[in-house]
């Protein structure tokens, strides 16, 4: 029961012990028979101290900026976390706390390696990076990445002046000539002239119809003399044809029913006009 009480008291003290007392008092007991100096003489309940503990505020370990990030991480984790049962540790000096001795408090190197960038280029802080950045354009095609920009949550980008300087620097010695594009109006005229010269001699070609602006009206097909004679005979007997008779006449004269119908309509209009004007007078 005493061993369990000792371990429980150690866990509680490691959480609530202030820094000044924690630095001057050893963490582990000298032996299994001795008790901790802060442990009361009589222990009734191992968990009795949990109800009255208070957690004092400590300054934050991580600063506002990332200026203490080293270039290489430690090989093992034993320097950050210490096992409770492995060995006994003496009092720690007043400069640093033993629980927070880690690579975070080591001085940083001169450059910050970028994991996503190729290894051939080195993006680091240059000695004259600040002066060149405030004065004018940065030399070269790459911009130095400053840690202050990463601390503020932004990434340094070259201003428009720097971009113009970089483009002018890369364009030295190379003559850039702008090729004039084709004028749409000239292109249309050229195509029209080419088509006109190609199809102007062939009027039967359907491609050249739009060039010659030929009429879309169907060519007139006059009736033959035999057809007109037979139609005139039929008109003398009947000025109006029935559907059956119109079909027979069209079949005999090798015409369509629509052609026969139109001819009879025109013939009736001509007769009507002739009757209206009267017969011509003989001198």
UniProtKB/Swiss-Prot annotation:
Task: Read off the PROSITE patterns from this record.
Answer: HOMEOBOX_1, HOMEOBOX_2
Pfam (any one)? Homeodomain
Major location, coarse class?
nucleus
Q: What SUPFAM superfamilies does UniProt report for this protein, alphabetically?
A: Homeodomain-like (SSF46689)
The reply to whether S-adenosyl-L-methionine figures as a keyword in the UniProt entry is no
- Residues within the DNA-binding region(s): 216-275
Keywords of the record, alphabetical order, are: Developmental protein, DNA-binding, Homeobox, Nucleus, Transcription, Transcription regulation
List, alphabetically, the CDD domains matched.
homeodomain
Question: What are the subcellular locations of this protein?
Answer: Nucleus
Per the entry, what this protein does is: Sequence-specific transcription factor which is part of a developmental regulatory system that provides cells with specific positional identities on the anterior-posterior axis.
User: What family does the database annotate?
Assistant: Belongs to the Abd-B homeobox family.
The name under which this protein is listed is: Homeobox protein Hox-A9a
Q: What is the lineage of its organism?
A: Eukaryota, Metazoa, Chordata, Craniata, Vertebrata
Gene that this polypeptide is encoded by: hoxa9a
């Amino acid at each position: 029961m005493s061993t369990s009480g000792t371990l429980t008291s150690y866990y509680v003290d490691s959480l609530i012990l202030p820094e000044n007392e924690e630095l001057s008092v050893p963490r582990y007991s000298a032996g299994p028979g001795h008790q901790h100096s802060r442990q009361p003489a009589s222990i009734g309940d191992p968990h009795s101290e949990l109800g009255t503990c208070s957690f004092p505020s400590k300054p934050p370990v991580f600063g506002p900026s990332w200026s203490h990030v080293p270039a290489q991480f430690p090989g093992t984790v034993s320097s950050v976390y210490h096992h409770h049962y492995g060995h006994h540790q003496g009092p720690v000096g007043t400069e640093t706390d033993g629980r927070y001795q880690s690579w975070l408090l080591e001085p940083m190197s001169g450059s910050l390696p970028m994991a996503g960038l190729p290894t051939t280029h080195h993006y680091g802080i240059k000695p004259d990076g600040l002066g060149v950045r405030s004065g004018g354009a940065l030399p070269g095609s790459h911009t130095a990445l400053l840690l202050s920009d990463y601390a503020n949550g932004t990434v340094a980008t070259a201003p428009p002046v720097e971009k113009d300087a970089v483009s002018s620097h890369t364009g030295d010695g190379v003559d850039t000539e702008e090729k004039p594009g084709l004028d749409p109006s000239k292109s249309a005229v050229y195509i029209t002239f080419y088509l006109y010269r190609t199809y102007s001699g062939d009027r039967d070609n359907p491609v050249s119809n739009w060039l010659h602006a030929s009429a879309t009206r169907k060519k007139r097909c006059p009736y033959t003399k035999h057809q007109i004679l037979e139609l005139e005979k039929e008109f003398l007997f009947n000025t109006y044809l029935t559907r059956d008779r119109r079909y027979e006449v069209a079949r005999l004269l090798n015409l369509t029913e629509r052609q026969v119908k139109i001819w009879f309509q025109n013939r009736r209009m001509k007769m009507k006009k002739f009757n209206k004007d009267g017969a011509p007078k003989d001198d």
